[in-house]
Regions:
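Membrane-spanning beta-strands of outer-membrane beta-barrel proteins
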Residues: 81-83, 123, 172, 212-214, ...
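Outer-membrane beta-barrel proteins
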Residues: 73-78, 116-118, 163-167, 205-207, ...
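Detector for outer-membrane/organellar transmembrane beta-barrel domains
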Residues: 217, 221-348
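Sequence/structural signature of outer-membrane beta-barrel proteins
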Residues: 34-36, 106-113, 145-152, 156, ...
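C-terminal closing repeat unit and adjoining cap/tail of repeat-based domains
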Residues: 353-369
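Outer-membrane beta-barrel "beta-signal"
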Residues: 356-361, 381-395
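Outer membrane beta-barrel
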Residues: 21-45, 49-51, 55-197, 209-212, ...
Length: 395
């Protein structure tokens, strides 16, 4: 009797419409130790090893000349344990519809400054995207996703969140609606982008796109395991309608890039070059400061910049991989005289890492990264070395 009941319930569940949806749960847990030879920052201006992006000035603390003790702090070595770059995603497929909902755990709200696990590791939405595959050629999408203008998504670094940003890597996540056309090796994507006003936000979100929509484009072609492409984002920052506006004019926010992936058996090379204006107003995470209104309500003109990154991957054997990367970005020479002592003028990073498969799903790694950062005003440069070692469990 019980067997018949169980069989009947199973038959009902199998034929229930809800089970026509195919769900999968994926994720990565990264546990590591991070050490730096002296002050390193994670996107902001505080000593932080959460997601290192550049070396800190050691002669300025909190925007003022550093005291001897503050300089000692900024020049001191530091070591921390980190798990904040872990992430997971829920994926769904149903006939022609696909979706992904992805979160990671990092101190994004407070500027990547909290490093204590119980204080910092809060869920942060990364991707929330819906795709409709109309046929084998056309896909329509909407939601928060990797920017159409992101180009190459990874810099080959185990610093997934830092990802060589502010040092030659550009293009992060964006809210978009658009379409992709694929035919043989050709892929063309176009999207409308935009962000609402957010006058109270800080950091990279301080001045969001005030006029919708922006336009993002990507065209790439794949052949014989290689890929070449070009991408861009074009928008306008509408400051003239802001509540505190007193003088100035709207600013262009542009990003243009070319990129390539070349595969030669066990060795592959990724490279990208970009140029643009007001990258940090586009969530493209450039080296220059964002545009915005100053305390008097005057528009701070956008800064032009350019940069590039490249990394080489060597698949030593089925279990071991070595990656070597180099990236550099700088503010345009015509705009450098407007930089302050705490603004970045040029930032360069070089890194090498080794990953080894310990068992199915589990990889051990070690990475060394060197940052050299030149600041505005007096154009002094500062350097630091960051080491990291740990394990990644993918499920």
């Amino acid at each position: 009797m019980l067997n018949r009941v169980a069989a009947s319930c199973a038959l009902i569940l199998i034929n229930s419409p809800v089970y026509a949806f195919d769900f999968s749960f994926k994720g990565m847990i990264k546990s590591e130790v991070v050490t730096s030879s002296q002050g390193v920052a994670s996107f902001g201006g505080a000593y932080s090893q959460v997601a290192p992006t550049h070396a800190l000035r050691t002669d300025i603390f909190g925007g003022a000349p550093a005291t001897e003790q503050q300089t000692n702090f900024l020049e001191s070595e530091s070591t921390s344990f980190q798990a904040a770059q872990s992430r997971f995603s829920l994926n769904m497929n149903h006939e022609k519809i696909r979706s992904v909902l992805e979160f990671d755990f990092i101190d994004g709200e407070d500027g990547f400054t909290n490093q204590t696990a119980l204080q910092a590791q809060e869920p942060r939405l990364r991707r929330a995207t819906l795709y409709y595959d109309m046929d084998e050629n056309w896909t329509f999408f909407g939601g928060q996703k990797w920017s159409t203008a992101a180009g190459i998504k990874s810099s080959g670094s185990y610093n997934w969140i830092g990802n060589a940003y502010r040092a030659g890597k550009s293009g992060f996540l964006a809210v978009e609606v658009g379409a992709t056309y694929k035919n043989d090796g050709l892929m063309v994507t176009g999207a409308l982008t935009g962000k609402g006003r957010n006058a109270t936000a800080g950091g990279i979100n301080a001045n969001e796109l005030g006029r919708m929509p922006g336009l993002a484009l990507d065209v790439n072609y794949s052949f014989s395991g290689h890929k070449i492409g070009a991408a861009g984002h074009f928008a306008e920052l509408n400051f003239e309608d802001e509540a505190g506006f007193t003088a100035g004019e709207n600013q262009d926010a542009t990003l243009m890039k070319v990129y390539t992936t070349l595969n030669f058996g066990a060795v592959s090379i990724n490279a990208e070059y970009y140029t643009g204006d007001a990258l940090n107003n586009q969530n493209a995470l450039g080296v220059a400061p964002s545009s915005g209104l100053n305390g008097a309500g005057e528009v701070r003109e956008s800064f032009g910049e350019s940069g590039f990154f490249t990394y080489l991957t060597w698949k030593v054997n089925t279990d071991s991989t070595i990656k070597v990367g180099y990236a550099s970005a700088s503010v345009d020479s015509s705009d450098r005289n407007r930089l302050s002592l705490t603004d970045l003028n040029e930032n360069t990073t070089a890194y090498i890492n080794y990953g080894h498969k310990l068992m199915d799903g589990l990889t051990g790694f070690v990475q060394f990264t060197h940052f050299n950062t030149e600041y505005g005003g007096d154009f002094e440069d500062f350097s630091t070395v960051v080491g990291r070692a740990g394990v990644v469990f993918k499920f």
